Amino acid sequence: MSNMDFLPISKEDLKKRNIDVLDFIIVTGDAYVDHPSFGTAIIGRVLEREGFTVGIIAQPNWNNIEDFKKLGKPKYGFLVNSGNIDSMVNHYTASKKKRHDDFYSPGGKSGYRPDRAVIVYCNKIKEAFKDSPIIIGGIEASLRRFAHYDYWDNSVRRSILEDSSADLLIYGMGEKPIVQVSNLLRYGMKIDSIKNVRGTTYIERDISPLKDYIEIPSFEEVSTNKKSYAEAYKIQYYEQDSIRGKTLVQKHKERYVVQNPPQPPLSQEEMDEVYALPYARTYHPMYEAEGGIPAIKEVKFSITSHRGCYGSCSFCALTFHQGRVIQNRSQDSILKEANMMTNMKDFKGYIHDVGGPTANFRHRACKVQEEHGTCKNKQCVFPKACKNLIIDHKEYLSLLKKIRKIPNVKKVFIRSGIRFDYLMYDKNDEFFKELCEHHISGQLKVAPEHISDKVLNLMGKPTRNVYDSFVKKYYDINKKIHKNQFLVPYLMSSHPGSDLKAAIELAQYIKKMGYTPEQVQDFYPTPGSLSTTMYYTGINPLTEEKVYVPKEQKEKRMQRSLLQFSIPDNYDLVKEALIKAHREDLIGNGPDCLIPYNKPYKKSHKKNNAKNKNNNYNKNKDVSKKNKKNSLSKHKKRK
């Protein structure tokens, strides 16, 4: 591919296209990948469709002002995002250790973007072009639009609008608001006059003209009073709906952060249009010499079926970003994309995913949402399925069957996560059987996250009984179809509500599983989630109940070690945790003991685990009839 297949990145590109001045310039913390899994590509192509010229400055050197000037000054303004992931999450682990890789950067190496990228980029743009409008968006800006607890500073920070000095913030999925805002700018409206576009947030000194709004506790209140913080979050949480949500206002000293109600969800036709735009579907050729961009590998042959999630896991911020209403593409649109993939020269016959935040949530949860919006005080699937929930996998299954029939398609995988409780609610087993027979390869990843009902309740996850029933059914189905496939559980330690007793309960469950799970992570308090509010305040904002929060690094290390108690390096911490919890009965050589009396000889865990994995899985299969678990994916995306 040539540079002409991509949006312009240099003055040379502008000359070839006869562009003197760009309408917009997108500054992003990711490398430039022109694929619909990347927000920069979508917004750039949507604006191009509307007749605007758009340039890309990807991963500029924030220590060199000239990098921000290389495409000149745009006619209407700069659009700034940190990339597909919050820059702080991208740079640091849950234990605040620096990461050494970055899948969204050349060669997978870190160091191409600054901490708090949105703030840094905006300040540099202001330095280069003082009067040029700046609009911020993407995950980092969206989840920091109000005063928020910042785990890395361990303090409450102001709205990112204040710290970045940006003129406007677009939250959530930005196609509709950016089109409306860009057209208003084209018609001659000044950026500081754009105050009525849904899905936007701005700063105002005088709120007297506002009507029908809710004022939440101020920055000064939430930064000094944890009850006020919890109250502010509760209001934000309940008002994230395009039909019933109200304008929200939060005072920051003498100014106010004003959030307009969310944009309506995209219609199916609008979704189809967005995903049919002329993406190059790969990274820019300028990265070839550095080994390309690793992030493209998993998504290049994956298909986004829908957006949104009504699972409402407490540790996930999707409610604040994509929303609870499912927005799906038509089958025709998805089949066209699948057919197009088969004609790509590096297609090997495998479509890696057809899904979204949760693969088997392909339609709105219920008909009520269409007229009244999402329910304010209850969830669709937690603590149990709502009576209005539409439980049906037929349409999704018919789509998968059609994709499987496309010439040159060997296998269609589902990797974006299956919500197992929703699967169990479906009395028709056809999808479950087809999933096991055609759409996994040896193992299925799902996310029970924990097995203590006390912790699961705070996580917004189904009870242990639901998971155990799922495990039994999964293995029963695999036995009937003569497949020896396994479950890989994603588990989480140190979530609010998880004390040593709960961690030990989970460790005992793992013991019965028969193998050491590798997919374990500590709870990561990222902006925008209900769990992060619990972590900071020690309060469940929705119930106002006090919540135990493991914050000391020692206890967090103990809890994580308990989940991998068989690793020799974890022996001392596990023993200390068991003694502290008065569970010495789990130390010894008995069948239920987690560790022996004496520290085992240190072996290479990886080598040993690889050697025994098949044996352990075979044990696991037998044990699974009694107990077992599953799992799911990513930082941002554990279902």
UniProtKB/Swiss-Prot annotation:
Binding site for [4Fe-4S] cluster: 309, 313, 316
Keywords assigned: 4Fe-4S, Iron, Iron-sulfur, Metal-binding, S-adenosyl-L-methionine
Cofactors named for this entry: [4Fe-4S] cluster
Residue stretches of biased makeup (Basic residues): 600-610, 626-639
Record-linked SUPFAM superfamilies: Radical SAM enzymes
Span list, region Disordered: 597-639
Pfam family, any one: Radical_SAM_N
PROSITE patterns (alphabetical): RADICAL_SAM
Positions of the Radical SAM core domain: 295-566
NCBIfam families, per the entry: SAM_YgiQ
Alphabetized HAMAP family for the sequence: UPF0313 (MF_01251)
Family: Belongs to the UPF0313 family.
Protein name: UPF0313 protein CLJ_B0249
Organism encoding this protein: Clostridium botulinum (strain 657 / Type Ba4)
